[in-house]
């Protein structure tokens, strides 16, 4: 009985969250499929921030070729940002959900249970991140745009020399 109730609850929770989020960036459009069945709080947070226009105009402040691109910090320093909950929220790990391919969308953090508004998109498999960052979606369109962003010239701190921005983020 408890399993049935949990399955019904997760199904209802999933229905409340948009299945796709679109980023119009300086390099083109990226579409993400969210996975609320894997990370309901992270998806709710991401969708809530998108609905508020939080990501509009924010830059990808950290780009490491052969690893990932990171954004979601309104200060552009890698130290800012806040969740819709007004405080950091807990990690959501599933043993069978792994960083096994490029295009994984995950929460950036400063350690355990410190998720806020920052996220990253992998450009290669990154198994060393399993159990360290909450995976909550993946790129379903625009991996070519992710590749363009990945290849932007950066400085010694992995910051793009020319600003790379999320012009507009919205639910599909």
Feature annotation, model-predicted:
Residues 1-4, 161-163:
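Extracellular interaction modules
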Residues 11, 15-172:
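Cyclophilin-like peptidyl-prolyl cis-trans isomerases
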Residues 3-13:
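Sec-dependent N-terminal signal peptides
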